């Protein structure tokens, strides 16, 4: 047998094994021929696929690179890009897809997967354009249609997404991606029963999909079907037991329905993976927020003893220590984390916070925060901490420019739509509608409200008359606020103003029984606002009871700073303020409820 015949036979046999799903057998065929076939690009391509099938990503990357060095073929570059995408290295993958398309602009696998990499990177507008371009040349391409639907979904275009998903289901009624997509969009729009039906159909078709069961659980929770929601979440965790986000969603739901198994899933998973930092830090934070600081500390110390990532654990230990008032211990942990990972932004953020909490280095904290803000200029949390550092260092002029309450905090009153005889009638209509959405029993521990309830999912994405008229009434006032913002290219708020806006998140809160909001900022906003729908009479004559307050930091400190500015809530009024402002409320003394709608705004 000639050398060429041996090469061809080796490649054919290996390709057959790979096609049959037997990468180990393909590897056994290829490895003995490495020296003989080392000059052949296709040999390295198949070897790479065999290594990838065996889960050896490093060996697969090396073999793909060897193939490309001999002959840079578009399909090999695409396969290398796919490898990086599977490793969640979307930026690197994108570069290789671009190289493949530079060699063959019509290479469809590279086009499709490049668009999916854009989805991975949250570049939804770019992904939408990429999928639209593919569909112009390939109008019946199912994968591209699904990709366009998913991009539209992420851009808030739920109706368009529904039409695209339905077009796939028309030709393939059991397509699980489309069934899942229909369920997500319908849930987002508030059509909960229909969402449950689609997601149940999807779960029947893909009983091993944790994503489908997670989305089904969320829809069942919205439908107030508690037992079924818990069962669906449990099923999802059984399929993906170490998914940190899934544990978070599940326990977030268990917490607000006062379920006795709250936090149990974390402990079960940590018994199997005691060094899992993501699970340990998430559990510790929930324990701390539930008033169980010593347990939180023990969880983190156990993960550290098990060999978990030291910088992350020391960072969270600092947080747990300082919120219990152990300021010196917090600073020791924060500095330890900074020595281990000096360039990590979360580590530096915690060090700055620990320095201020301990009272040991206000100037150093400000230097750290100023450095971070040069890299992350729209981070609302950094601006909140920076404001605190400016106040501690008596940097009055700069603080006044950043925190000018009289200029930056606005109060407006909505106008009732024409269909309502009065503002009071409008308010009562909204109260009645939103009451139906408050289906839980307790406040989420991760959020600011204490003693109350919060609606599930994004409120303003729902398609309901009450939500539509509320948004329109609020937008009329919010655009007026934007029109009156002064121009200032150097200010973190004014410099981003475009005159346009979109809601990035929204919810309704009901406080009761001495309820209040802890001091906090809004990390996902640019402007934030509270709209008041029900206000107890007591706030009019008690000492700031129920009032919204500004300026008091939301972390425990050795030398506390007090609030600086208060506003009296009024039914029908909205308070608008920069998202980076620390704000909370004074506790209520009466059992009567206070109802509000909160929302974050981003410039468009």
Range-by-range predicted roles:
Residues 19, 53, 86, 120, ...:
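Register position in tetratricopeptide repeats
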Residues 8, 42, 75-76, 109, ...:
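Start-of-helix register in tetratricopeptide repeats
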């Amino acid at each position: 047998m000639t050398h060429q015949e041996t090469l061809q036979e080796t490649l054919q046999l290996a390709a057959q094994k790979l096609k049959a799903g037997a990468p180990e057998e393909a590897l056994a065929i290829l490895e003995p021929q490495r020296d003989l076939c080392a000059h052949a690009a296709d040999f390295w391509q198949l070897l790479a696929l065999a290594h990838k099938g065996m889960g050896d990503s490093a060996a697969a990357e090396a073999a793909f690179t060897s193939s490309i060095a001999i002959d840079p073929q578009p399909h090999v570059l695409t396969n290398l890009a796919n490898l990086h995408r599977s490793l969640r290295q979307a930026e690197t993958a994108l570069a290789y897809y671009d190289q493949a398309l530079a060699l063959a602009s019509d290479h469809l696998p590279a086009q499709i997967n490049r668009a999916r990499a854009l989805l991975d990177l949250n570049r939804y507008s770019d992904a939408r354009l990429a999928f639209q371009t593919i569909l112009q040349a390939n109008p019946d391409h199912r994968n591209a249609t699904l990709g366009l639907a998913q991009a539209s979904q992420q851009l808030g275009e739920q109706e368009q997404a529904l039409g695209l998903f339905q077009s796939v289901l028309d030709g393939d009624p059991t397509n699980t991606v489309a069934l899942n997509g229909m369920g997500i969009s319908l849930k987002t729009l508030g059509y909960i029963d229909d969402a449950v039906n689609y997601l149940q159909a999807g779960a029947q078709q893909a009983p091993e999909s944790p994503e489908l069961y997670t989305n089904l659980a969320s829809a069942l929770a919205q439908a107030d079907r508690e037992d079924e929601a818990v069962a669906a979440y449990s099923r999802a965790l059984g399929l993906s037991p170490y998914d940190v986000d899934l544990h978070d969603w599940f326990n977030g739901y268990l917490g607000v329905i006062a379920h006795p198994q709250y936090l149990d899933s974390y402990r079960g998973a940590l018994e199997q993976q005691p060094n899992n930092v993501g699970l340990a830090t998430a559990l510790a934070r929930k324990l701390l927020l539930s008033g169980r600081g010593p347990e939180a500390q023990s969880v983190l110390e156990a993960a550290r003893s098990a060999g978990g990532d030291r910088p992350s654990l020391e960072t969270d230990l600092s947080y747990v220590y300082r919120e219990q008032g152990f300021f010196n211990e917090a600073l020791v942990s924060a500095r330890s984390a900074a020595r281990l990972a000096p360039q990590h932004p979360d580590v530096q953020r915690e060090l700055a916070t620990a320095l201020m909490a301990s009272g040991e280095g206000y100037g150093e904290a400000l230097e750290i925060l100023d450095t971070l803000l040069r890299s992350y200029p729209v981070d609302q949390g950094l601006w909140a901490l920076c404001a605190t550092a400016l106040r501690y260092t008596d940097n009055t002029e700069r603080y006044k420019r950043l925190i000018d309450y009289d200029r930056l905090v606005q109060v407006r009153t909505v106008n009732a739509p024409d269909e309502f005889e009065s503002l009071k009638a409008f308010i009562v209509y909204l109260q009645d509608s939103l009451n139906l959405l408050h289906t839980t029993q307790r406040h989420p521990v991760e959020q600011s409200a204490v003693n109350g309830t919060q609606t599930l999912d994004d409120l303003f994405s729902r398609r309901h008359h009450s939500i539509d008229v509320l948004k329109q009434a609020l937008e009329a006032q919010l655009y007026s606020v934007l029109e009156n913002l002064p121009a200032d290219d150097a200010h973190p708020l004014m410099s981003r103003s475009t005159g346009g806006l979109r809601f990035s998140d929204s919810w309704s809160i009901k406080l009761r029984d001495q309820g209040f909001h802890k001091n906090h900022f809004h990390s996902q906003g640019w402007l934030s606002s509270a709209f008041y729908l029900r206000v107890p009479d007591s706030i009019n004559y008690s000492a700031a009871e129920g009032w919204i307050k500004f300026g008091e930091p939301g972390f425990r400190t050795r030398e506390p700073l007090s609030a600086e500015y208060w506003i009296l809530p009024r039914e029908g009024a909205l308070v608008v303020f920069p998202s980076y402002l620390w704000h909370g409320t004074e506790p209520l003394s009466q059992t009567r409820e206070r109802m509000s709608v909160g929302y974050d705004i981003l410039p468009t």
